[in-house]
Amino acid sequence: NITKDHLDYHETFRKYKLSKLKILNFLKENGTFILDADNKLLNEMVNKKKFKSKNIIKITKDKTYNYVNDNDYLQGAHNASNCSLAVSIAKHLNITLEKIKFAIENFKGLPHRMEPIYISDRIKIINDSKSTNGESTAAALKSYKNIFWIAGGQPKSGGIGDAKNFLDRVIEVFLI
């Protein structure tokens, strides 16, 4: 994932992108690079880079989206994209579709990352306190409707960024 984050450490978005691409320097000639074809920025960056390996697999959001939505821990288009990448890697490693589906359906998520705290027919309480920038907050807000949003922490440059595009889904905001 390449988003405008960690600029406090990298200083500029350009330096951050270059830092992310350094991992590709370790890709061996017979190695495989799996690329999220839906990510325009990542595609632009990768197209400019020379690789030792010619084995590049481009993937898009595919059938994984159908069963991602059944898992309360994997809501949202960003998680569909993450699952698509994971499925592509698993297929490349010859893991059966049955095992892949089982793993996705039984994934319990990570603490503070769109973590379901309470779910009933009427209400969902989600802890997404790891969303510390506008882009990750936007991904969370885009995943739900009728939101009561509790926000806090230290402001980052760029404010709430892309999250402002999904404020129509928010009923009330509580700043702490």
Q: Where do the protein language model's features map onto the residues?
A:
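Nucleotide phosphate-binding/pyrophosphate-handling subdomain across enzymes
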Residues: 72-171
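Flexible active-site lid/hinge loop adjacent to a nucleotide/diphosphate
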Residues: 1-49, 63-74
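Short, conserved loop/helix-junction motifs that constitute active-site signature segments
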Residues: 23-30, 49-52, 143-144, 164-171
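Short, surface-exposed linear patches
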Residues: 2-4, 18-24, 55-59, 78, ...
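Beta-strand->loop->alpha-helix junctions that form or flank phosphate-binding loops
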Residues: 50-66, 76, 101-105, 115, ...
